[in-house]
Amino acid sequence: MRIFTLLFLLFTPILALAQDHDAPYLKYPTLPNFSILQEDSTSWFTNRDLRPGVPVIIMLFSPDCDHCREQTEMFTKNINKLRNIEIVMSTFQPVYKIRNFCKEFDLHKYQNFHIGRDVKYFFGPFYRIKFAPLLALYDKNRNFVTVFEGDTKVDKILEALK
């Protein structure tokens, strides 16, 4: 019994060090398959619906988050710079909050904005979100570029996507 206890105490720290600390997006550096429930609460938007050959921004947000609102405002004010980028905005909040958010920022008029609810709670664990908004950037070939947490200037995003 003492030998078992001794072996257990010796190998427990080794097993703890062997734990995987990398977020899934770092292990799988291409745009993941996803689906979000759109604000009409009946249709889905998936990664297959994105325009091919253009960069993608995945934005994890909350309609109640001030920084998320500032980021959305920065996007809409700089829409001419962002027209050739697909922007997927995902939240875990209820659809009615998404609907109100879309109306407030008039997001329906932008064809490159896709807003919905992550009903499968895929994105949070995939990116290990700590701060909102989280912006995950992918190039035109759908390869991972970088992640920004917190509101980020549009020019900094565009520089990263060059």
Task: List each language-model region with its residue ranges.
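Short, internal strand/loop/helix patches
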Residues: 105-136
